[in-house]
């Protein structure tokens, strides 16, 4: 295409546009004269370099082919298919446009105020000759179809062809992969598929298109058509360009003014910004100051609350509300940490708070120490309070009744497991405080120490009270020294000094027993309470804090160790008292050592088996005392029988009770032996001797020993008392059985020898102070030996029953000795009467037989026999039954020997018969003899009968 002139020409026969129709005539003339087609292609704002553009006259005229108009309804099926995608696209497009307008709102405002014609703003930047005058509307995003505002029945211009159906458009244009870059699609669209591809060629030959002249000509024609259409479009828009250029100039001017004004505004704005920055800095500073002031107020308020709570904590500590104090301290620490986080201020680093924390540490330590002390004092106080519910006498009666040493009592021991609610609450609070202060271990250790000290003080206090009971009349200095003295120091001093320095020597047995009773039973009550306290503590620890439950093992040995402390104290006391223990009567020893054993048994029941030397020491002391008692009793009995006057004494009921107990012990242990009697006075021996010389209406002549009745002498009562003491000792202390058996046999052996020597020996008159030995002496000696034998058998059977031991050969031998000695006493009676009959019969040779009355010899013999009978019948009926017949037979034999020759003389026979008749009559009337008159019958028979006999 050749180059043509660029003179403007707009006479193409096209109708004028809407914009050119409204322009002023003057403006149109000037624009026509000044503008050219070339200027339309230049940059209207910045025409830096010219661009060559051909004029209309330079373009070869081409006949435009009409473009068919397709009605919108033809596109409805297609638009219906893409309605949803198009609706989303339209919605996004409108949103983008709205954001763009909001972003450039100022520019649009300035454009609206300019003199640009509004119609230019409504004109689209892209237009075609086929676009109608009215704008098409966007489809509604909620509708399923797309509609336009144009009318399908608009009559086209005369240059347009008739409507045709869209179905005549090749379907390739509606494919989703439509792309002219694709050679095959291009071949189909260009309708030259037969040129590029033969029937037998699988692929198109693109070189054929380059050599096809028809195709080249058609493409040129297409390009010319496109160019003409572009020129036509430009021509349609050319009428508006002058107005646009003028508006652009005006816009440039206004823009320069606006730029200047904007520059001034920017300078002012800069100043305003600087002032704003300063004001903002000031505001920030003020806000910061206000914030800091608010923070400071909050900090001050927090500190005020903290100090107020700290004051309350101090008051709680002063008032011993330790748990509230500990919780208050912990609450203060928690508040400080919480407020530090909330206020973003390290309150813990403040000097006042540091000082407060130091005070808290002091209070915490004070609370810890106070709670530890209070915990120990509270439990020990409860222990002492429980031990004083009952007094010592009531406790003694209950424990003795429990061990069947006295009759049953109505009262019982208070329950050690009963704790009131206040006690449990106090213990619970203390454990909470100890757990929070990590001082539970220290508290339990101190509690153990306090318990040990309490038991030491308990024994020491009762010991001091017992000493002061005897020292009340002494000077105050001595009493103070005794109160301050400890048991160990007193024990050491008593070993170094004489026995008179021992304060126990001045204590009576009643006072000493009362002291032991207080120590023993108060200690047992304290131990019972401690065991219950330990159970309560372990239960609370197991429920409250399992982490510190292991600390309860500290209390495992508390009971055993406490019992050891008590036993050490009482062992020391008993060792001190044992120096004067030999003077105690058996009842007192039984009472004291029964207390020891009861205390030890209760200790084992409460605390288990202990390793203390208490019971071995007690039993060793008891054995030593028993040996001394055995020796003393044997010597006392031997001396008593040695000085015995052998006079029968009346038997009082108390003596009969002694005999009954000794006799009954072989079958059943007498109740009196198992019962515990209170300590007796030291003048017990004198009181016992009073009833020996006192005769009352209740006294009897003999003592009943089972079915036998025996006359007793003064020493026999002492024997029964000694055996009664032996029985009590064995009933209470079965461990003494071997020593008991040995001592008892030694005692009976000594007594048997002593009685045998005194009664039957030659020194009787000198040792006893008797002028001569009479029949009653021998009869009472026989009764005494019978008492020995019966008592020995009964006591040996009692020993065998209680201890399960068999009778030894020594016992049988001693019993046989008693039998032999009894037979010897019988022989002694016969021997004495033989001497009397020898003296009396010496008169027979000088007698005259012609008198009618009994002779003197037979009268003397009858009197001697009657006297013997009376003595034996009164003092020993057993011997009377055994000895009188023997004496009568001895008399008959001697008389037969002396009177046989005389009786053969008929002149003398009547006198012999009178003597013998008198003898037998006196025996029958005075002695109750009912036997045959053997001698008289012999002398009355004839000589033949006598020879036959």
UniProtKB/Swiss-Prot annotation:
Gene Ontology CC: cytoplasm; cytosol; endosome membrane; GARP complex; Golgi apparatus
Membrane topology: Peripheral membrane protein
Domain of life: Eukaryota
GO MF annotation terms: syntaxin binding
InterPro entries linked to this entry: Vps54, Vps54_C
Positions of region (Disordered): 1-25
Coiled coil: 243-312
Protein name: Vacuolar protein sorting-associated protein 54
């Amino acid at each position: 295409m050749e180059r043509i002139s660029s003179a403007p020409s707009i006479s193409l026969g096209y109708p004028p546009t809407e914009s050119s129709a409204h322009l002023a005539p003057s403006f149109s003339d000037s624009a026509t004269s000044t503008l050219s087609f070339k200027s339309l292609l230049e940059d209207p704002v910045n025409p830096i370099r010219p661009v060559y553009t051909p004029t209309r006259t330079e373009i070869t005229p081409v006949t435009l082919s009409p473009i068919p108009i397709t009605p919108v309804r033809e596109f409805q099926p297609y638009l219906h298919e893409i309605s949803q995608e198009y609706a989303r696209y339209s919605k996004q497009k409108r949103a983008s446009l709205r954001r763009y307008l909001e972003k450039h709102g100022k520019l649009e405002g300035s454009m609206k105020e300019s003199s640009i014609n509004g119609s230019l703003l409504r004109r689209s930047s892209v237009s075609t000759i086929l676009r109608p005058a009215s704008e098409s509307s966007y489809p509604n995003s909620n509708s399923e179809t797309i509609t336009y505002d144009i009318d399908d029945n608009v009559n086209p211009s005369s240059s347009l062809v008739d409507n045709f159906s869209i179905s005549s458009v090749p379907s390739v244009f509606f494919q989703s992969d439509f792309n002219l870059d694709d050679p095959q699609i291009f071949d189909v669209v260009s309708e030259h598929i037969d040129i590029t591809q033969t029937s037998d060629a699988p692929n198109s030959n693109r070189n054929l298109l380059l050599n096809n002249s028809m195709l080249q000509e058609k493409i040129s024609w297409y390009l010319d058509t496109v160019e003409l259409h572009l020129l036509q479009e430009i021509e349609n828009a050319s009428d508006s360009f002058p107005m646009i250029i003028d508006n652009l100039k005006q816009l440039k001017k206004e823009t320069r003014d606006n730029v200047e004004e904007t520059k001034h505004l920017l300078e002012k704005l800069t100043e305003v910004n600087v002032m704003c920055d300063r004001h903002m800095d000031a505001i920030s500073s003020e806000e910061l100051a206000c914030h800091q002031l608010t923070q400071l107020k909050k900090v001050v308020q927090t500190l005020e609350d903290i100090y107020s709570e700290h004051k309350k904590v101090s008051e709680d500590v002063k008032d011993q509300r330790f748990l509230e104090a500990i919780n208050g301290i912990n609450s203060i620490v928690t508040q400080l940490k919480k407020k530090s986080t909330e206020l973003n201020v390290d309150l813990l680093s403040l000097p006042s708070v540091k000082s407060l924390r130091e005070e808290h540490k002091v209070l915490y330590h004070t609370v810890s120490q106070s709670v530890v002390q209070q915990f120990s004092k509270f439990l020990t106080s409860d222990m002492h309070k429980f031990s004083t519910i009952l007094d010592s006498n009531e406790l003694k009666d209950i424990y003795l009744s429990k061990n069947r040493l006295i009759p049953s009592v109505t009262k019982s021991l208070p329950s050690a497991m009963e704790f009131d609610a206040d006690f449990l609450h106090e213990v619970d609070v203390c454990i909470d405080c100890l757990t929070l202060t990590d001082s539970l271990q220290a508290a339990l250790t101190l509690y153990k120490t306090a318990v040990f000290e309490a038991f030491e003080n308990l024994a020491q206090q009762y010991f001091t009270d017992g000493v002061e009971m005897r020292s009340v009349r002494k000077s105050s200095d001595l009493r103070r020294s005794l109160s301050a003295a400890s048991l160990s120091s007193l024990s050491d001093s008593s070993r170094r000094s004489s026995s008179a320095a021992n304060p126990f020597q001045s204590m009576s047995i009643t006072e000493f027993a009362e002291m032991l009773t207080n120590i023993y039973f108060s200690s047992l009550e304290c131990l019972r309470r401690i065991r219950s306290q330990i159970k309560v503590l372990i239960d609370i620890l197991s429920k409250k804090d399992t982490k510190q439950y292991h600390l309860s093992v500290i209390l495992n040995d508390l009971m055993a160790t406490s019992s050891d402390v008590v036993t050490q104290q009482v062992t020391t006391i008993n060792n001190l008292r044992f120096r004067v223990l030999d003077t105690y009567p058996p009842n007192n020893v039984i009472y004291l050592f029964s207390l020891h054993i009861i205390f030890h048994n209760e200790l084992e029941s409460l605390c288990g088996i202990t390793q203390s030397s208490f019971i071995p020491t007690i039993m060793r002391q008891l054995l030593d005392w028993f040996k001394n008692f055995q020796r003393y009793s044997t010597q006392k009995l031997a001396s008593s029988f040695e000085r015995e006057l052998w006079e029968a004494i009346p038997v009082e009921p108390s003596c009969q009770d002694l005999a009954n107990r000794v006799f009954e012990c072989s079958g059943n242990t007498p109740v009196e032996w198992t019962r515990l009697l209170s300590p007796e006075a030291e003048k017990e021996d004198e009181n016992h001797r009073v009833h020996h010389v006192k005769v009352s209406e209740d006294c009897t002549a003999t003592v009943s020993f089972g079915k036998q009745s025996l006359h007793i002498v003064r020493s026999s009562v002492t024997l029964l008392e000694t055996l009664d003491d032996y029985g009590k000792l064995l009933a209470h202390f079965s461990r003494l059985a071997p020593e008991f058996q040995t001592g008892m046999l030694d005692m009976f052996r000594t007594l048997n020898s002593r009685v045998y020597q005194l009664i039957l020996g030659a020194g009787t008159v000198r040792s006893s102070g008797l002028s001569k030995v009479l029949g009653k002496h021998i009869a009472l000696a026989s009764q005494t030996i019978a008492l020995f034998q019966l008592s020995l058998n009964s006591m040996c059977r009692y020993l065998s029953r209680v201890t399960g031991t068999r009778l030894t050969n020594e016992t049988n031998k001693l019993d046989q000795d008693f039998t032999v000695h009894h037979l010897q006493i019988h022989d002694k009676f016969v021997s004495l009467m033989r001497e009397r009959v020898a003296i009396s019969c010496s008169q027979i040779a000088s007698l005259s037989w012609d008198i009618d009355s009994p002779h003197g010899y037979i009268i003397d013999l009858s009197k001697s026999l009657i006297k013997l009978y009376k003595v034996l019948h009164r003092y020993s009926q057993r011997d009377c039954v055994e000895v009188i017949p023997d004496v009568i037979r001895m008399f008959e034999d001697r008389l037969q020997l002396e009177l046989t020759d005389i009786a053969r003389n008929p002149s003398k026979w009547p006198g012999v018969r009178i003597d013998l008749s008198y003898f037998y009559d006196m025996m029958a009337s005075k002695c109750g003899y009912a036997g045959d008159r053997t001698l008289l019958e012999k002398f009355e028979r004839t000589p033949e009968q006598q020879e036959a006999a």
